Amino acid sequence: MKKLILSIALIGSLVSCQAPAEKESEHSHESTVIGYEFSDEGEKQNLIVGDVSIIDTYMEFIQAHNDRDIDKIMDMVQDSILIKTQDAQELKGKLIHRQVLEEWFPESNPIWTVRWMATNTVEVKDGENRHWLTTGIEIIETLDEKERKREQILDVNFVGKMIKEVSIYERSKPLE
């Protein structure tokens, strides 16, 4: 009887140590839904893991800002670029974008540092999926010989490798 109990215990422990077999899922070909976006009409649209290749494009875009390479920045945005600023302005088009950068760069010498990034894609029914990068950055500006630090979260919409829209949310850091 002791041998029988010992054998059952041994077999039970061996079976429990085996890795579980991978189950085939009828949904295994589908993307993982990580959240939802709601359209203006209230329609729920899947938010799925995004294309991480847009991270390289975004890092190149930030480097162009730090290098003050306005021509390169303009090459990376669509003609109809829309920038929704932290103070509720909407900058529309390359011309306005260029003018703002040409004034801002010499005025405050901003430096960008990327802190984090995440990509996602909105699955749109009967339309083209929208690819987004959400990123946290720090900007250090020098105004009147004093440094000012700002933290921003940006939602950046990509069409291919071109930036179509940017929404900026900001928190100013206290002066030190």
What residue ranges belong to the model's regions?
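C-terminal motif of bacterial Sec signal peptides marking the signal peptidase cleavage site
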Residues: S13-S16
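A short hydrophobic beta-strand element
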Residues: E128-I139
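Short, cysteine-centered beta-strand-loop-beta hairpins and adjacent loop/turn segments enriched
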Residues: I140-K149
